[in-house]
Amino acid sequence: MISRFSRLRQFFARKVADVFSTKEEPHITEHRELLLAGAEIPPPWAVYPHAETWWGGWRQGTSEYWLHDIWLPFWKGLDANAKEAYLAKWNVTDEWRENLSARE
C-alpha cells in the first residue's frame, strides 16, 4: 500500500515535471512515455552524466521525479539477466554498479 506521503510526493513531483519538462528537461516527457510503453529508459549516468553516484535523485525537482518515478520503476521491473545485459549495453561504471546493488 502506498502511504499518503508517497502519494502526495508523486502528485507534486508530476506537477513539477509537467511544468518544467518541456522547457528545461524535455527527456522527462519522452522517458515517461517510454516507461508507459514498456520500452527501455536510458540510465542515470547517461541522462545526468555529471551527477555523482551517491546523488540518489534528491534534488527536489524534475531529476528526482525522473529517478524515482520513471527510471527506478523501469529498473526494478527487469529480471537479473536483463539487468546485466542493460548494464553491459550502457557501460556501467563500478561506482554505479555498486550504487544499484545497494538499491536492490
Question: Where is each model-derived feature located?
Answer:
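Polar/charged low-complexity regulatory segments
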Residues: I2-E104
